[in-house]
């Protein structure tokens, strides 16, 4: 464990630090989220024997244990595998069937596919600046059967300048320092640094400044803790 990170976390959550450290080494929980564009809950519950209790974050998802990426129903887009709490962000957005939505940092596509499942005559723009990740995003959208959408691979400033106030809702799952990945990858614990946090915070601030020009309602999702993380960034950008 990175000593600088450990010291920082002890300052933020002194009474919970032991539980937090234990949680990093606990088995990673995963959920299977139903894709309403292709199926319904009753069908999946009748076919997928590995579904466990319903997710507390999404009424259309179940906790699962194991590896099901090669399951035929996953391969054909009937469900999407993601961490349970990840689906809570889109649920909080109150997506309406006719909304025009922008997912500004969209790859690999879990939240975009969830948004698409709530749209009827609305439209989704899913953007990913890195071309290779944009290809993964497009592949996942095709697998999930999403139609009323487009995938872009643009700088956020260029995209948002071209589409001022065009969106009813915007989601920014901004690149961050990787603290949310520490449970998955040991390297994220070792490579953490304050310099990287400052770099990520500057990048996030730029993305948010671009995004607000294109929005009606804005939703920010970050896993970074501290004054240079979610709270401080929101205070700088939200009136």
Predicted regions mapped to residue ranges:
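S-adenosylmethionine
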Residues: 1-239
